[in-house]
From Swiss-Prot:
Catalyzes the NADPH-dependent reduction of glutamyl-tRNA(Glu) to glutamate 1-semialdehyde (GSA). Possesses an unusual extended V-shaped dimeric structure with each monomer consisting of three distinct domains arranged along a curved 'spinal' alpha-helix. The N-terminal catalytic domain specifically recognizes the glutamate moiety of the substrate. The second domain is the NADPH-binding domain, and the third C-terminal domain is responsible for dimerization. This is Glutamyl-tRNA reductase. Homodimer. Signal peptide: none annotated. The lineage of its organism: Bacteria, Fusobacteriati, Fusobacteriota, Fusobacteriia, Fusobacteriales. NADP(+) binds at residues 179-184.
Amino acid sequence: MLDLENIIVIGVSHENLSLLERENFMRTRPKYIIERLYTEKKINAYINLSTCLRTEFYIELNSNIKAKEIKNLFSVDMIVKSRVEAIEYLFKVGCGFYSVIKGEDQILAQVKGAYAEALENEHSSKFLNIIFNKSIELGKKFRTKSMIAHNALSLEAISLKFIKSKFPNIEDKNIFILGIGELAQDILTLLTKEQLKNIYIANRTYHKAEQIKKEFDIVNIVDYREKYPKMIEADVIISATSAPHIVVEYDKFVAQMKENKDYLFIDLAVPRDVDERLANFKNIEIYNLDDIWEVYHLNSMNRDKLLEDYSYLIDEQMEKLIKTLNYYK
């Protein structure tokens, strides 16, 4: 039986925890904790939506554990929603209500990715399948009708704006990218359109860097173990790795850096890749995800109006979902 009583969402995001708090939370290995509950059959199913701004678990409960008990497994302030409220929350997440850039497309792709991963690893359920399919369907419809994503700024586009504010003429600048995940590749796509001649990438797994080289012939591969000599020659260092620790270490960078050269770091990792003490140097600037959130939150008023005007689509989708669930009773 598909019972709304069994649906909860639990997690953290940039809206309820700071970057530092989210970093500490990720070090507790939350996915392992939820996976253990699933393995022990204390929950029926789960889907993990994990991005640079949020880590959330959409869970179908059973009689073996309560939402409060799951929350108590974690030591941080968690988002906990249940029943209709949990589903409405997912719908709004998929539509971009809680994104840094309201209505941006990337979150919908991430919802799709989370759902696909759950299907592949066989820890979803019929109930969660219905809910996530409805969310993805709504996300597409919402953007089409509201046109909220028209000329939308993505994280990578925002990063480029920060770079251009520091270096208006970036064509002759050296760009060094650490990590080649999805976000780093999106940034690389934008940078290649700027007629840059000097782009370097370093990744812990070398063959993955070689694959990127095939797609972006303009890039130069740097051995990850030899990253510092090339990094200190760069004007802009973009770091977006998935490492659980500092990647750009204070002592190693300071020992080799040029004091008469300006450096701009764009740190898009959670936990952060760049030792924040480097910002104490006058010739070094560091922007991280919280900086992006702070700056662009001020420019979201127009998008907020669109969210309000088209929120009726969420109500309509919820009605359709209830009808679907009633059909299976």
